[in-house]
């Protein structure tokens, strides 16, 4: 059995070798000749999986180690009798922590407290729910917009997008990309929406590039609209609008979900799905794969305020480490993908062990996802 895996899927070689012969290949472009005798294909979001790629090939199963699936023609796979699995929620924690890193940086730079801001979350799935929970643990007001969930009657106080635009100081998008249909998200943030944002608002897109109309956004920024912008995703990736990058406050190369934990979850989820598909079901404990964190332990004295939280968050991950490299190489062919391929190891907050002498600080840090314990001062 021959299994092709994306060369940038951590632990893929070791795991899938339990099931067959493994060949690691680049995801963009994928070497088509390798598909001629392969039984399974494991990809990431950079690989377009459709009829033109797989027609006439012996592939029986496709797995994507990503939460999103807009790069996969699921309907054609089903029609062709090819098994499929994604990894929903695998990088949700990573994306939430990317948003926090960005907001805490902007808050420090511009001198505001997040408690004074209302955060509008568009898309309340794996990412949106976790973001809401962490923000509310800090006492920060959130407004939720998710029409599909609202129409299904899911639990939640869902508002219209217009209401979020009117009342939110921070608007962050966490939706799939739907190009048509009743829940279309293509250019959900169009010129009208962008112009309607509150003066000084923060706009964040860490889902799919085309959810925000990049041309319209650049037009508004060029005209002097008072707006802070965080973009991790771009229309036309791996190409991006260099002029737009120059205007945004934070710009990164589609790496919001790129923690080691998130990548490992994606790999293990599709591994487990494929093992079940071929009748050799196996399960993997994530902590048996991950290395020891870079940080040992730190001690925190007193309560948890915003500056302290910012220091802890940026000790684990400071978004500026990914903004600067993109600006240096933007517009150079191949460099966007190279940044992603050679991405520095990044961990999640849970990798940081924090000893607190304040019980409320320890409790709050645990709610936020840190590995915190309370040890009273002697």
Swiss-Prot record:
Q: What's the EC number here?
A: 1.1.1.290
Report the main location listed first in the record.
cytoplasm
Its recorded name reads Erythronate-4-phosphate dehydrogenase
Q: Where does NAD(+) bind?
A: 146, 175, 232, 257
Domain of life from the UniProt record:
Bacteria
List where this protein forms a coiled coil: none
Entry GO CC: cytosol
Annotated Gene Ontology MF terms? 4-phosphoerythronate dehydrogenase activity; NAD binding; protein dimerization activity
Enzyme superclass (EC): oxidoreductase
> Where does it live in the cell?
Cytoplasm
What positions constitute the catalytic site?
208, 237, 254 (proton donor)
Q: How does it assemble?
A: Homodimer.
For this protein, the record's Gene3D superfamilies field holds: 3.30.1370.170, NAD(P)-binding Rossmann-like Domain
Q: Name one Pfam family in it.
A: 2-Hacid_dh
Give the organism, scientific name. Answer: Escherichia coli O6:H1 (strain CFT073 / ATCC 700928 / UPEC)
Identify its protein family: Belongs to the D-isomer specific 2-hydroxyacid dehydrogenase family. PdxB subfamily.
Tell me, what does this protein do in biology? Answer: Catalyzes the oxidation of erythronate-4-phosphate to 3-hydroxy-2-oxo-4-phosphonooxybutanoate.
List the lineage, top down: Bacteria, Pseudomonadati, Pseudomonadota, Gammaproteobacteria, Enterobacterales
Q: Which InterPro entries match?
A: D-isomer_2_OHA_DH_cat_dom (IPR006139), D-isomer_DH_CS (IPR029753), D-isomer_DH_CS1 (IPR029752), D-isomer_DH_NAD-bd (IPR006140), Erythronate-4-P_DHase (IPR020921), Erythronate-4-P_DHase_dimer (IPR024531), NAD(P)-bd_dom_sf (IPR036291), PdxB_dimer_sf (IPR038251)
